[in-house]
Amino acid sequence: MGIITLSGNVLHLLKAYPKKGLEEVSQPEPNTANDSSTEYKGKSKDDFQMVEKSNTDERYNFTRTKKWFLLMTSEYYKLMENRLLMFCIIACSFICAIQFLFFIIYWTNIVPRKTQRAITNLNYDYLTAHLKEQCVPYAKILDQCIL
């Protein structure tokens, strides 16, 4: 229970931090008409054109990014505030990790033991039947060795 309340407190702190940071960054800039500067553009020195520089595209991209970020953070926090869903995600990942570990232990420990047991008990029937299906010369060699 303590972990769930601690994670809830951390989520509330994280929820407040991005909104506070974005409010500081996205303060409205003063709109000055005299501040617009001009820029020369052209392919060669002879055909330059005077073009007015504008920050409207940059402001538009920033506001789009800000809105997208706020939307994503709010959806993330709505999702993570549901403690039952958070518990299910953690439990499923824990179960998957345990199953993966048992799978590794099985293939590194039990399968070689079964193969070794088959060889030590001189259980060549399986091996000869398998090799006879694969290639005819192996069947002749194994029949001579076993007999």
UniProtKB/Swiss-Prot annotation:
Region of interest (Disordered), ranges: 23-48
Biased composition annotated in UniProt, kind: Basic and acidic residues = 38-48
Specify the domain of life of the species encoding this protein: Eukaryota
Where does the UniProt entry say this protein principally localizes?
membrane
- Bias class Polar residues marks the residues at 28-37
Q: How does it sit in the membrane?
A: Single-pass membrane protein
- Its signal peptide is none
Give the location in the cell: Membrane
Keyword Membrane on this protein?
Answer: yes
**Origin species:** Saccharomyces cerevisiae (strain ATCC 204508 / S288c)
Q: Where are the transmembrane segments?
A: 85-105
A single cellular component GO annotation: mitochondrion
Protein name, per record: Uncharacterized protein YGL230C
> Does the UniProt entry include the keyword Membrane?
yes
Organism lineage string:
Eukaryota, Fungi, Dikarya, Ascomycota, Saccharomycotina
